Amino acid sequence: MGQKVNPHGIRLGIVKPWSSTWFANTQDFASNLDGDFKVRKFLNKELANASVSRITIERPAKSIRVTIHTARPGIVIGKKGEDVEKLRNAVAKIAGVPAQINIAEVKKPELDAKLVADSIASQLERRVMFRRAMKRAVQNAMRLGAKGIKVEVSGRLGGAEIARSEWYREGRVPLHTLRADIDYNTSEAHTTYGVIGVKVWIFKGEILGGMAAIAQQPEQQPAAPKKAPRGKGRK
């Protein structure tokens, strides 16, 4: 059977930036990497209900700068910035260097694979029918301008005795096109029947010009040009 490579990993340096952007000497690399892992683990646990999409980490001049991309910045910041100050102190303690925390708002959570996967997982935990949750996520993404979306759920769907996988796709999701901007992420729903895995692929268009184009327009990316539909090969 054919296996699917992680869409983010295969596009790193082509159309996808790294989530940790720092350079370290050989003796510091392991401790920095371990620090990044611990910081992310802590923030994801603390901000489990804050709709966090991703966390990017930079390390300028013996300090750490953490950018939290979230759809609900008010929850992260807290009243008069109290919560974000607590997070800053905790991150500085974990990393062992002075910390700075920036908050970036995710304008369209329906087009973010992590937030869509978490939304489907939370619906499954509330006993919403899996087909309804999948279809709703697909419709919302397409309505807000996605070029294509695929959602897959795996596990004891509907409490069935035998685990299985079901998926739903709308539009184009070209996994082999490296210039395609594909957002991919996963989540887990912990139900009374066991764990149900959720995978989401969202195709937002094609990025022409590679990383240089992303650097010039970090937020807005060009939409994919319309192409004629491909044939199905020889019959």
UniProtKB/Swiss-Prot annotation:
A molecular function GO annotation: mRNA binding
The entry's keywords: Ribonucleoprotein, Ribosomal protein, RNA-binding, rRNA-binding
CDD domains per UniProt: KH-II_30S_S3
Entry superkingdom: Bacteria
GO CC aspect terms: cytosolic small ribosomal subunit
SS bond list: none
Pfam family, one: Ribosomal_S3_C
Gene Ontology biological process terms in this record: translation
Domain KH type-2 as annotated: residue spans: 39-107
Function statement: Binds the lower part of the 30S subunit head. Binds mRNA in the 70S ribosome, positioning it for translation.
Homology family: Belongs to the universal ribosomal protein uS3 family.
Summary of subunit composition and partner proteins: Part of the 30S ribosomal subunit. Forms a tight complex with proteins S10 and S14.
Protein name: Small ribosomal subunit protein uS3
Native species: Mannheimia succiniciproducens (strain KCTC 0769BP / MBEL55E)
Gene: rpsC
